[in-house]
Amino acid sequence: MDDTSFLLDWPRGNVTFAFEDFGGEQTSVQGLDRDVLSMRSALLGMAPEDDAAGKASLTLSVASHAAGVALVRFLYLGNYTIEGPDEIHDPQFLIHAQVLHLADAISCPELAKLAMGQLNYNAELAVSFPASPADLVQTLIFVYTHLPHLPEALSTMLNYCVASFTTHKLSEDADFKRLAGTHDSLLSDLSKVNAERGFGKYPPPSLRTATT
């Protein structure tokens, strides 16, 4: 997801996006064209400031370098995923939650819609796989921490957990059990979704005992 080789097909510009992730690590993507950036985000096209040498830069706070590169892919290509439309891939959640967070931060509804669509798609896809994606717990933590104002993201993740709780043996997953046992509202939120899906007012025994 962090491959920038697609930029080789475009004229080189003078704009650099500097990315700083939540851990303070800094990376960058150079050679961006201001006119291309402006086509999908007038804000990001205007925001980079020129220096005396005629070079422009903009620093963005991102959850990961991959999320920053995903933004650049979207600005250039109109999408940020690498897979073709008919290509089946292993589902993953975290990158799409991170891109959604970035899209919200820069007020880019088109990118936010794409990211939310990818999160929904991967959640639906993951149910048919034999095990849950490795980034499930990381994504739950990220959504609760950074996207509480976007309820659709949390709803998507909770519905996946309820739908696959038994088949993916989440009650036996050490990381999931640890999160369920320490998080303020995960179990109660899962119980609400369980009831909304018509599985009863209370969670199944495996869900009630997820922390044991």
Language-model segments: residues:
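Alpha-helix initiation and N-capping motif
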Residues: 41, 68, 133, 183-187
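Post-BTB helical module
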Residues: 66-172
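Short helix-loop-helix/strand-helix junction enriched in hydrophobic and basic residues
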Residues: 33-45
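Eukaryote-biased recognition of C-terminal alpha-helical segments
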Residues: 173-212
